[in-house]
Amino acid sequence: VWKFGSSPYRWKKKSRRDIGMDWNILYTNGDAPSLKQIAEYIDNPLWAEFDSRIRSAYRIEPYMDYSRCSMQPGWNIKYKKSGKSLCTCYPMQGYFIALVVIGSRELTEAELLMPLFSDYVQKVFRDAKTGNRQKWLMLEVRDKEIMNNVIELINLRKRSISP
């Protein structure tokens, strides 16, 4: 598929992202995307910054997993440290969703931090149901403030490694 480029006489190949397809249709269970394709699909500099900060702070590499979960099916990116899940990220067009599970050990501290977080993160936290003294937060990372809030929540789960 081709689309007209910015120059009056130049055509350029349309990427999968330009087509406007859902992530789980673009990359099926047998067709894992590369990290470059993930970045192209998200098409937001916050993704590269988030990924870099998590990798650096925890000295980890993400891995991809295919989910059939009805909430967010398709390929996702998982970050784990010492067997503990830090977060799972779901690529979206123009942003990404970060799933952070606030466990029973982190819940009180997270509640104390909430007034310092964005109104959006506070609302998601407040509206999330608590089960087994856990809250599952699906946070749409669309701006830097939300990204920083997500990183602070991850840090509650596992303290980052000092440089």
Segments (PLM) and residue ranges:
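Charge-dense, helix-prone N-terminal extensions
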Residues: 4-163
